[in-house]
């Protein structure tokens, strides 16, 4: 009865509402009667004259697009503008740049099409970059590399570090420019497509479009070498040899080489902000240089104590240059006479500089001084003639040295941003410097293979007809000890550290660092990691000519190492394959059976003929020799 009474009351209430507001009652819906627009019973905010008209959304139009732009890129531009809301889209086809432009395809092959766009805010850029990453992953089937995209979440470790940094106060070089996250996001897509998403302020400040302007030229230094950012940390006499795989790694310094040096005034590494020296200090510096140069001309180590006492007498330690000169002199003493000056004595010359109170104000950038000293100390550990110090000890000494000098840093020190530091750090993982370097390999190829070593022998093939490169070859027993000892645990730790740093900062391992590791693995006979790096490097090569060039270099390296198993692996697995795998014969045919130059062709021919002579009767080497005789 109660429910029936409630239902009756509800129906009465509905009838009242229908009569009061002009509503018709249905079982499931309520709707208004159609009334005139000027009816006063319609609220003002529901009248048609007060309703905004929908805006017409036009399809995005792109002006001045490069010709022959791939359809995938056009679809990408529509996605960036229509769906992600980016504006100011600019597309640059690097194939249209002049051949002498530093970003042209003739000088680099990583970037082909560059897209630059602006976002409304940092959150907008983060959302657009995240959606673009997911779109490329699912629609293109490619895991793209993105730099600069930082999530808003923060780990507990980061919060503790920020709190600790806040208690210390702002650094002396505090600068807010560029530190905000998601103001510049770079996305690397397949087929050389690079997308830059920036905030309007960051885009105006960086002006990336200027870098791709057709009028830009190389910015060379005074020696004609292309400028690189890390060169600012190096003195003029330490510029990197970029043509070498081991660029930045100096040749092994030993006692016999010091007597061949000409008398030159020493050049020390100083900071640009050092205070000017007085005439008396300049006279002292000249005297120290004179002692250094006089000792450099000595052909024995009997007078090392005399020169050391003479230098210490003239040393005042009033300038940073004095300490740098002392380090160079003590290092020379150590290299020529380790018994006179120990490694600890040379290390003390670097550490004493930071305990000298009178030179604190002479440099405005002690971070730069610390970076230079770390590089110097690394070179010292590599060049030291003391064989009793193994790789593990050197790595521990380096760690201890960095820990001591880093206490004097005014801001964060980014050593791994310097390529030379990575090169020298990897060199510490062996008991000595690799005797075979890229300079050796390049010189052999330039000499058409005339100085190629096989099994510790030197093949002199001068004045030999091109068709008979091994005839009348005089073989001398000038042995070359190519075997080195690798610190397995240290190499593993350094390798993983370098991989982590480079993948975080660059998205990949640089080719020159992979090649340095490859040379180390070959001379330490670590063939498991050697072939792993070989496959990784060959997969990153862009053209058949690059593969041919790299194959010839690898063959020359293995001939000098003279490991029969590795040579047979190269000339069987990677010489000719029946499947679709990359190999020399297939890439040689793709390249029109052409080499980079005649020197490369003759170097390959010489290496194959010498292998057939060194291992007579072996079918693998005989087939390679037949190819060289008939095709090269």
From Swiss-Prot:
It is a peripheral membrane protein. GO terms for biological process: mitochondrial gene expression; mRNA stabilization. GO terms for cellular component: mitochondrial inner membrane. Residues 257-287 are annotated as: Disordered. Keywords: Membrane, Mitochondrion, Mitochondrion inner membrane, Transit peptide. Residues 1-26 form a transit peptide. The keyword Mitochondrion applies. It is found in: Mitochondrion inner membrane. It comes from the Eukaryota. InterPro entries: Atp25, NT_sf. Belongs to the ATP25 family. PANTHER family: ATPASE SYNTHESIS PROTEIN 25, MITOCHONDRIAL. Probable mitochondrial mRNA stabilization factor. This is ATPase synthesis protein 25, mitochondrial.
């Amino acid at each position: 009865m109660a429910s029936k009474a409630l239902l009756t009351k509800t129906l009465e209430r509905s009838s009242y509402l229908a009569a009061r507001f002009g509503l018709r009652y249905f079982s499931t819906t309520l709707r208004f009667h159609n009334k005139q627009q000027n009816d006063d019973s319609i609220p003002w905010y529901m009248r048609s004259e007060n309703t905004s008209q929908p805006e017409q959304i036009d399809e995005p139009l792109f002006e001045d697009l490069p010709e022959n732009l791939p359809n995938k890129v056009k679809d990408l531009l529509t996605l960036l503008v229509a769906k992600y809301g980016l504006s100011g889209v600019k597309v640059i086809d690097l194939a249209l740049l002049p051949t002498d432009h530093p970003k042209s395809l003739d000088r680099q092959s990583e970037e082909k099409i560059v897209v630059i766009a602006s976002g409304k805010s940092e959150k907008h850029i983060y959302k657009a970059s995240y959606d673009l990453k997911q779109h490329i992953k699912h629609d293109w089937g490619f895991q793209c590399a993105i730099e600069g995209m930082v999530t808003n979440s923060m780990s507990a470790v980061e919060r503790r570090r920020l709190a600790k940094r806040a208690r210390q106060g702002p650094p002396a070089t505090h600068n807010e420019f560029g530190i905000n996250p998601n103001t510049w996001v770079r996305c690397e897509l397949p087929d050389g497509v690079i997308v830059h998403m920036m905030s309007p302020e960051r885009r105006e400040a960086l002006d990336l479009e200027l870098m791709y302007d057709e009028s830009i030229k190389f910015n060379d230094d005074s020696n004609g070498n292309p400028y690189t950012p890390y060169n600012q940390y190096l003195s003029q006499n330490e510029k990197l040899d970029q043509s070498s795989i081991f660029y930045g790694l100096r040749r092994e310094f030993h006692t016999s080489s010091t007597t061949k040096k000409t008398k030159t005034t020493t050049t020390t590494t100083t900071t640009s902000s050092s205070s000017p020296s007085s005439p008396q200090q300049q006279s002292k510096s000249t005297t120290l240089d004179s002692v250094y140069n006089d000792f450099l001309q000595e052909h024995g180590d009997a007078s090392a104590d005399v020169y050391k006492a003479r230098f210490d007498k003239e040393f005042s330690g009033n300038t940073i240059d004095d300490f740098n000169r002392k380090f160079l002199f003590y290092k020379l003493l150590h290299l020529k006479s380790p018994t006179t000056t120990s490694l600890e004595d040379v290390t003390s010359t670097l550490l004493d500089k930071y305990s000298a109170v009178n030179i604190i104000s002479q440099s405005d950038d002690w971070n730069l001084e610390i970076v230079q000293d770390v590089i110097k100390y690394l070179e010292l550990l590599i060049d030291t003639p003391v064989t009793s110090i193994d790789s593990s000890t050197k790595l521990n000494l380096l760690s201890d040295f960095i820990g001591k000098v880093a206490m004097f840093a005014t801001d964060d020190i980014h050593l791994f941003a310097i390529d030379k530091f990575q090169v020298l750090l990897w060199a510490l993982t062996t008991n000595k410097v690799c005797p075979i370097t890229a300079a050796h390999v390049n010189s052999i190829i330039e000499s058409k293979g005339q100085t190629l070593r096989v099994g510790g022998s030197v093949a002199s093939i001068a004045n030999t007809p091109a068709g008979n490169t091994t005839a009348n070859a005089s073989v001398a027993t000038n042995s070359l000890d190519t075997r080195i000892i690798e610190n397995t645990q240290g190499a593993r730790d350094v390798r993983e550290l370098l991989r982590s740093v480079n993948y975080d900062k660059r998205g990949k391992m640089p080719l020159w660092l992979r090649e340095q590791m490859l040379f180390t693995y070959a001379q330490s006979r670590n063939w498991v990691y050697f072939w792993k790096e070989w496959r990784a490097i060959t997969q990153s090569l862009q053209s058949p000519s690059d593969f041919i060039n790299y194959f010839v270099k690898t063959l020359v390296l293995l001939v000098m190492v003279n490991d029969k198993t590795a040579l047979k692996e190269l000339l069987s697995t990677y010489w000719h394959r029946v499947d679709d795998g990359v190999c020399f014969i297939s890439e040689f045919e793709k390249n029109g059976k052409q080499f980079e130059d005649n020197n490369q062709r003759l170097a390959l021919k010489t290496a194959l003929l010498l292998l057939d002579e060194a291992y007579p009767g072996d079918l693998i080497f005989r087939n390679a020799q037949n190819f060289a005789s008939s095709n090269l």
